[in-house]
């Protein structure tokens, strides 16, 4: 079964997603709650969502919050020999992770698959064939960053006018405006 892949990211106007292993902007509590809700809520009873992230993204999560709870966590790394403490699975590449999800032990347990970073993992996911959705929080100002989100190819990805459970109006926290967008590529 080929499942749709979902990427979720918050990105500043200059496409920044990280700085020194953290977000370039101050903590936006409601934006974080949106991330938690979207990546955790399964639409199928008895199944869990699964999150895939690179090694640096994993270690950027405060230890007390690892693994991301109520989700199956896969960490990608070519260097690590075993899953980092708290992670459920380790895979060498996104392709390997996607194959792992279709193995009998996981196939029946997984509902939605979410890619949660970082840059190279997003890039690889966005170039995958097939059905992809990008859940993008547009932080409506620039922040100094050292990690960036790949350009969204609007020939392939269509911005959806609305999406269930996603607010369409501009949000504001700590004087920072942002809005939620959903892009889709049918593959």
UniProtKB/Swiss-Prot annotation:
Transmembrane segments: none annotated. NADP(+) binds at residues 10, 16-22, 55-57, 77-79, 117-124. Keywords: Acetylation, Cytoplasm, Methotrexate resistance, Mitochondrion, NADP, One-carbon metabolism, Oxidoreductase, RNA-binding. Residues 4-185 form the DHFR domain. Residues 8-37, 60-70 are annotated as: Involved in methotrexate binding. The modification N6-acetyllysine is found at residue 33. One of its GO terms (cellular component) is cytoplasm. The keyword RNA-binding applies. CDD domains: DHFR. It is found in: Mitochondrion; Cytoplasm. Substrate binds at residues 31-36, 71. Its EC number is 1.5.1.3. GO terms for biological process: dihydrofolate metabolic process; folic acid metabolic process; one-carbon metabolic process; response to methotrexate; tetrahydrofolate biosynthetic process; tetrahydrofolate metabolic process. Pfam families: DHFR_1. It catalyses: (6S)-5,6,7,8-tetrahydrofolate + NADP(+) = 7,8-dihydrofolate + NADPH + H(+). GO terms for molecular function: dihydrofolate reductase activity; mRNA binding; NADP binding. InterPro entries: DHFR, DHFR-like_dom_sf, DHFR_CS, DHFR_dom. Belongs to the dihydrofolate reductase family. Key enzyme in folate metabolism. Contributes to the de novo mitochondrial thymidylate biosynthesis pathway. Catalyzes an essential reaction for de novo glycine and purine synthesis, and for DNA precursor synthesis. Binds its own mRNA. Homodimer. This is Dihydrofolate reductase.
């Amino acid at each position: 079964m080929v499942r749709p892949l979902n990427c979720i990211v918050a990105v500043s106007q200059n496409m920044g997603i990280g700085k020194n292993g953290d977000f370039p902007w101050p903590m936006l509590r409601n934006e974080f709650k949106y991330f938690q809700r979207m990546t955790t809520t399964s639409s199928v009873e008895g199944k869990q969502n699964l999150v895939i992230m690179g090694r640096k993204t994993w270690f950027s999560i405060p230890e007390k919050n690892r693994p991301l709870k109520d989700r199956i966590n896969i960490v990608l790394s070519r260097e690590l020999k075993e899953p980092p403490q708290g992670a459920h699975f380790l895979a060498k590449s996104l392709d390997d992770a996607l194959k792992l999800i279709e193995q009998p032990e996981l196939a029946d347990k997984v509902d939605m698959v979410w890619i949660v970073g970082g840059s190279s993992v997003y890039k690889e996911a966005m170039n995958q064939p097939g059905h992809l959705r990008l859940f993008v929080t547009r932080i409506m100002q620039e922040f100094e960053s050292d990690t960036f989100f790949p350009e969204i190819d609007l020939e392939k990805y269509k911005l959806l006018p609305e999406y269930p459970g996603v607010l369409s109006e501009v949000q504001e926290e700590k004087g920072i405006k942002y809005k939620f967008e959903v892009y889709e590529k049918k593959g």
